Every structure is written in C-alpha cells, then in structure tokens.
Amino acid sequence: MLTRRMQCLRGAGVFRTVAALPLLAQRPNFYRPLTCSALRRNNDHSYRHESRKDKEMQDLKESRKMREQEALDDAAFRNTFEFAVEKTRDSDGKSPEPEVEIDVDREAQTPWDPVGSQSRHETRQEHRERFDDIKKTLPSSVHESQPQMYKWFGEKMDQIQAGALTAGQTLNEVTGYKAIEKLKLSIEKLEDEVLEARAEVREAKRMYSDAISERSNSQREVNELLQRKHNWTPADLERFTELYRNDHANEHSVNDAKKRLGECEHHVEDLTLQLSKQILTRYHEEQIWSDKIRRASTWGTWILMGFNVVLFIVVQLGLEPWKRRRLVGSFEDKVKESLQEWEARNEARRLEEATMAATATQAITELQRRIESPHVSKADVVEAEAEINSIKTNLATWFKEREEEEKEEIAKEAHELAVIAEDPDMTDVHHKPHPPQPVDTERVVRPHLVENFEHHVADPVHHPTLPITSTPVLEEDAPPPRIHPLVQMSPDSPDDGTKTFTATRDGYDVHPLVVRPTTPPHFMLQVWGAAKLSVESATNKTVAVVRSTFQTAEQRPFESTIVASLGGLCGGLVTFLYLR
C-alpha cells in the first residue's frame, strides 16, 4: 500500500514542486490524509501558479531587456549627436562643449518607471529636433535647397561630361581602339593567370620534393632495419612491416606529385606562350591603329592646308580688291562731293562778288559822270572823289573779310579730306577725331576782284576820257589774282601786266588762262567758266590716276602678300615633312 501511494505521489510530480507546502501549512484545520486525486488537484493548482509566475518572470525579463536595448540606443544616439555637434562647432570656430559621460550599465540597471521613461522620451525628442536643425546645414540639405537653375546647370554639366565620355567611346569604336582595349584587358587577366600558375608550380615542386624526401627517409630507415635484421625486436618487426606497407603509398605519392608538377609546368608554358602571342598581337594592332591615325592626321593636315590656301586666295583675290575698291570709291565720292560743294559755294560767292562789284562800279560811274559834268563845282568834285575812295576802301575791306572767312573754310575742308583719306568709312567728320593739321592756305585761295577793280573802272575802251594814270592803284602789294582754289598764277608772267593762270591738280597743269590788265568784267565770267572746266578736267585726271593705281594694285599684289604666301607654303611643307 505504501509502495503504491509512493508511486502515485511520484507520478503526480509531488517531488518536483515545493510551492504547494506553504499552502498546506496555512490550512491546518482542513488537513486530512492526501489521496491521489487530492494530490493531483493540488499539483494542478501549483502547476498553474508556477506557470503564471514563470510568465511574469519572462515578461519582466523581456521588459528589462527592452529597457537595456533602449538605453543602448539612447547612448549611441547621444554619442552620435554630441560628435556631430562637436564637429559643427569646430568647423564654425567655436569651442566644443564638455562631453557627458554615459554609463550604459547603470542606465540598463535603472529600474523601469513611467516618469523616467517619459523624461527620456522627451530628451530623445529634443535631441532629434536639434539633430534635424543641424541636418539642415549639411551639404546634402544645402544641395536640395539650392535654386533650380543651379541644379539644372549641374545636370547639364553632368550630361556634357557623360556625352564627352560617350563620344570618346564612340571614337574608340570608330577607330578600332576598343578591340585593342579589350585585348589589353585580356593580357592583364592572362598575366594574373600566369602568376597563379607559377605559384601552383612552386607548390607542386615543394610537394614533389617533400614526397621524395619522405620516400628517401623511409627507404633509409628500411635499410637500417635490414642491416640489423638478426637483432630485430617485435617493435622493429612491426616498424619494418609498416614501412614496407607505406613504401607503395610513398611511391604513388611521388608519382602523383611528379605528374602534377609536369602538368603545372606545361600549363605555365601554355599560358606564357599565349601571353606572348597576345602581346605580339596587341603590338601589331597598335601599330596598325597608329598608322591609320597618322594617315588620317596627314590627310587632315593636307585638307587644312588646302583650306588655308583657298581662304588665302579668296581673301587676296576677292576680299582685298573689294576692300581697296571700296576704299577708293568711297574716297572718290567724298572728294567729288567736296568739290561739288566747293564749286557751288564759289558760284554763289562769285555771283555775290560780281553783284557787289557791279553795284560799286555803277555808283563810281555815276560819281565820275557828276565830276565830268561842266557845271559841277570844285567842292562837289572833292566830295565825289572822297566818296569814290570811301566806296573803294569799303569794298576792299569787305573782300578782305570774305577772304579770311574763305581761308578758314579751306582749312576746315582740307582737314575733312585728310580724315576721309585716312578712314573712308568716316561719315561724320565734323567731330574732328584727329587734331587739324596746318594747311597752306596762301596757295589755295579764291578769286579776288579787288586787284583788278581799278582796271574794271578805268577801262580805256569804255571810259576813254579818263586817263589810266589818274586812278591810283590801291593794292599794289596785293597777292596775284586768283580765280579758283585749284588755280594759281604762273610764275613766268611777263612785265606788261599780262597774267597766266593754270589749274593745278596733283601735279597736272591744264588749260592755261591768260588775263590782261584791261580784262572787262564780262570776260572775267568767261575766265571763271574756263577755270571751272580746268578744275573738272584736273579732277577727272586725278580719278583716272587713282583708278590706274587701283588696277595696278589689283593686278600686282603687294610684297607683303607675296611674303605671306611664301611663308604659309613653307610652313605647310615643314608641317607635312614633320608628320611624314
């Protein structure tokens, strides 16, 4: 019976638990002998209690483990954050703050409490906000906040770089250098294989030498045992048997090592031969490629030289003549326009001077008629002569002022012509880009009627009653008569008063004009017309000379052009010889 009950107790697991004893001790009044069913119920209750306690312990361990992991994460985050803050302050030139030491074990062993977890959560949130503020100043954030134009420019530059790389690859494919690059990579790979094969050969030699040395040692030991065969012990017999049994294996190992060594050496020879062939092939292909590029470079040089020669011919035979023609034509137009303006002004001045001279002549004629009348008194004669002298003086003063004005205009027009000759494209010459040069205005003058005024008034043909000697010559030292700015008096004038005027233009003397002292005003008008014809003829001759010069320059290039042509041809020849 006792044995059976012990079996029941052992089967119920009473000996495995101790938790049910205090419960039984707390209820002494209800104590009764235990039966198998009661013990089974108590054991079930204790088992459930144990399971609940085990579950609580497991939950406690898991919560403690989670707290430890959170403490480790917080410590790592704080370390990272402090490091980032220190680096940022160092980069800004500020002094770093003192580091805070964190005891991870103490953080992990701290009992869990909701208040502490809330404070740590707030601290973690604050650290994350500060880290977000610092993250805004990082290069990646700055790049994201850059303007769209800057990003677009960066993308375009990347595309251009990629396009340049693609163009280089395309050029290599077109020229055939890509296959050479593949061959180069194959050679490099084969060199690595040769190095590995040589290492295998060295390893095979070592194994072969080890096998030979092991077999030699075994044979030496066998020979030693055979020499003392009559003194063998059981151990010597066993050793001899073992050595004799291993001799066959040693022989096989030596043969295998020798065979493997031969295979490795043969493999190295094959790889070396293949490497040599590929190196020779690469050298041959690179030579062919370099010859192709050199040939293309030669043709490109010839094409460039031909383009330069064609461009030189076009410039010298097309552009330069057109430029010279344009310069000459522009200068001709400016000169003709200036001459036309000059002639128009001279015509107006001539008419004005003729009108003034005619008016003065009429007035003086009336005064002379009054003097010649028989009923005039001596006082009236003196008054009339004084009035005549006054008219002559005023007329001379007026002509002198007009002459000064004309000299100034001549100097101005000469300066304009000089500017036009220097730069025919200059249209606004009144700004005077260059300082005016002194002009010889004494040689270039206009007609002056004051010198011949006495002869006009005292003409013996129209006034036979008035002797020539009775009229004084007011301007004996006046310059010789001048009809046109381009008309000057011949220095070989006779002493009888006859003057010869010649229209001069660029060294050409045309239409000599002979003027006598008694030339009437109406003949002076004919002289004016002849002078105009002389100037026009001189202008036409000047234009003819300019055109002849232009044609000569067009047919015969300048020496500098010839030198430049020879220099270009010599340079091209030297370049071609150098490339060849």
UniProtKB/Swiss-Prot annotation:
Q: What does this protein do?
A: Required for the maintenance of the structure of the mitochondrial inner membrane. Involved in mitochondrial morphology. Causes growth arrest when highly overexpressed.
Please give the organism: Yarrowia lipolytica (strain CLIB 122 / E 150) (Yeast)
Q: Give the transit peptide range.
A: 1-20
Instruction: State whether keyword Coiled coil applies.
Output: yes
Q: Which GO terms describe its biological process?
A: inner mitochondrial membrane organization
Could you list the residue ranges forming a coiled coil in this record? 177-275, 377-423
Q: What is this protein called?
A: Sensitive to high expression protein 9 homolog, mitochondrial
Here the segments flagged for biased composition (Basic and acidic residues) are 86-108, 119-134
Cell compartment(s), UniProt:
Mitochondrion inner membrane
**Ranges facing Mitochondrial matrix side:** 21-298, 579-580
Residue numbers spanned by region Disordered: 45-68, 86-134
A single GO cellular-component term on record: mitochondrial inner membrane
Which topology term describes how it sits in the membrane?
Multi-pass membrane protein
**Which family, according to the similarity comment?**
Belongs to the SHE9 family.
Give the stretches traversing the membrane. 299-319, 558-578
Database matches in Pfam families: She9_MDM33
